[in-house]
């Protein structure tokens, strides 16, 4: 029995088989589903829930009953708002909300203090969601393909952030707050409206910087250990790698703290993807020490 043949509160038969296998994981992706079956919220021991590309329009407040949930994939649906109940999942570490219709996040979103990976690409966000500023454990933040024009001055409060994707937004100037994000490993500003860059040497941990498809005439000033993607990047990296009569020892960029951090930044662990397709993903694969 497929999901389209089930009542809104029933689990499809194959989903029940998934649970009987002993794995605390439920895969509902790709089914026709306007709302989450009520029976799902009764699965109090569930740890991973995938509901991607179903046409989902709403979530029940009862989703807060999934107290053991670690991974929740809701990308490529039709969600316009999130219930407060979603903000009360104490163990949630990875949340995928890309490709929906979100204009904002609930104020209680800041309660997701275990969250380490958040993907919000392809929504309708015009302002940086301020509840995110309180998520100090967040490591990977995907905000590509939204409508952002500025970043809050308080952004450096997010001391755990290591990867920040801002491609496909509406930035006309390099956001000053980014210069105080000294722990960032990956920064993607591809496809914006940037006409130039400040000196990026203050970003001491930076390993990959993508600025392609902006109206700039050349690469920014960065440390020699940074892998660049954009106009003039290949030439710049070739120049700095040429041997000199008195070569200086180059200190390698700080490595990832552990394999889990690398997985969060490069793979994301979400719904079978490695990240957004395109030049920046290729850059990550090519960058020394960053390939998967």
Model-inferred region functions:
Residues 181:
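Conserved active-site motif detector
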